[in-house]
Amino acid sequence: IRELVRSRGLGDVYKRQGIYCFSQAVNENEAREEAQACVYVLNGRQLDYPIYFDTEASGAGNGRADGLGVEDRTKCAVAFCEEVKALGYKPGVYASTTWFRKRLDMSQLSNYYIWNAHYNVASSPIACHMWQGTCTARIPGYGGQIDVNISYMG
């Protein structure tokens, strides 16, 4: 978004950067490969925020990882995060409150940054480092809708 906003003449509004990987890994090896691909694409560029393992349903509901159970999904998240850490970046996990509560074992994720998506509430219902509170915000000069995220990382 930073480059998009800058190109629309709105100035350097967004300064901190991080990335996420919409994971379709179905095992730990694939999760590590996804982490390696993220770092490869960065080509040495440093980030302010973590590299997040994004786990959520695919748009059509038929993604490779959609049917993973809690144990396997959590193993993939941990493998991704540990690989990101080994490659010199901060690791994190992105999911909705429902996914954190029902599709991941949060007790295994305490060493990683948590980015929680939960809309139409005053604050995140789970402890997190970043909270995505809406996906329908608008900013002047941009014709579409954007996500709004609140960082508690300082």
Task: Say what each PLM segment does.
Residues N27-N43, S58-A79, E83:
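Alpha-helical scaffold elements lining the catalytic groove of polysaccharide deacetylases
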Residues F100, D105-G154:
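Functionally critical loop-and-helix segments that line ligand-binding/catalytic clefts
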Residues R16-F22, Y49-T55, K90-Y94, Y113-N116, ...:
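Structural recognition of the beta-strand scaffold that forms the well-ordered cores
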Residues K15-R16, Y40-L47, E82-Y89:
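Sec-exported extracytoplasmic/periplasmic mature domains
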Residues I1-Y14:
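Single conserved hydrophobic/aromatic residue that forms the stacking wall/gate
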Residues D12, V78-C81, M106:
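Short amphipathic alpha-helical segments and helix-helix/interface helices
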Residues V84, G88-R101:
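Aromatic-lined carbohydrate-recognition surfaces of secreted/lumenal glycan-active proteins
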Residues Q24-E33, T98-K102:
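Acidic-and-aromatic substrate-binding clefts and catalytic sites of carbohydrate-active enzymes
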